Amino acid sequence: NVAQAYAYEMYVGGFWCHQNPNNGESVNERLSKVGFPFTTVGENLAIASTVRSGHQSLMQSDSHRNTILDNEFRRVGIGVVSGPIGLIIVQVFS
């Protein structure tokens, strides 16, 4: 799962951003690398104490909510990793 792998990568690498600062990969490149077909892609990231609070936080942000509700997306992958600062949550939409 691309979302789970990226959540873990951020946890181990000690970063939290859409583009991996160590290798420059974007969500598009991560999907392409595993051969996942897509035309449109979106990614949401959150750090929260629970999955519910992370989702609520994303839904309160206009841009993140728009990604979640975008009817062009037909698939979603979700990754969650628990660390010392809480849960790292990654949502990948295509």
Model-derived features: where do they sit?
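Functional surface patches built around histidine and acidic residues
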Residues: 1-94
